Amino acid sequence: MANVYDAMKKSQAQQAARRPPGQPEGEAWAGAAAAGPTQLYRPPLGRCARNVVIPYDPAGRIAEEYRALRDNLCCQFREKKFCLLVTSAEPREGKTVTCLNLAFALAEDRDRRTVVVDCNLRRPQVAALLRTAAAPGVADVLRRAATLADVTWNTMAPNLFAIPAGRAVAYEVGDLLRSPVLDDVVADLRHQFDYVLVDSPPIRVAPDVGFLGRAATQALLVVRLRKTRRPSVSRAIALLHAANIKPLGLALTCR
């Protein structure tokens, strides 16, 4: 009996080692598929925030709206691969929540790998919503203090990954995003992943989106219904064009 018990414990340990981090024992996310190759496996740090709705209510109306957004975006790309900037005109428009829900919707394609990159180095939100560590992250890679493998985290979905912003002080953000290292980072991400979503600062608040035009030449503009005024949206679109970033469309959010 002792040998059987030891064998069972060994089998359970092997299964746990293969289980994607972020997925509790005996629990599967509705959109989950078999895990593909990843950079690192890390212990789970807890479930993501409830306003990232797809893992919690995959059959709900809001989840379906994010899938419709996903399908509309994918129709605009001949190849099923893209690198997309997700931004907003003003703060508090639901930009990061939209970015993460879109990422979970994309991750329902079991044959594709998706990564969310938090490039809002001034006010990052991705790590807080996904309950992952805030650092190291993008800032550390741009300083050459870490590699992409060091900062890439698993999520509740086996083929969805996240890279937090890391820690940066305001005066160095421009220099970090201006660094040629950013070009290498983007090239590596495009090679490793099918869908790259870059969460950026609000375009009318911070000047960083201009630098991020090197990372993604197309953008989704998030607009809060009955809050964001039309002149603000028009100005945001003009700023995207000035940075050589093509707006692919608007995503309307509401409370």
Give the predicted meaning of each segment.
Residues 106:
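Aromatic pocket-lining residues of Rossmann-like dinucleotide-binding sites
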Residues 49, 141, 163, 216-224, ...:
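Conserved beta-strand/loop subsegment of P-loop NTPase cores
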Residues 40-67, 71, 75-78, 89-93, ...:
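P-loop/Walker-type NTP enzyme "switch/lid" segment
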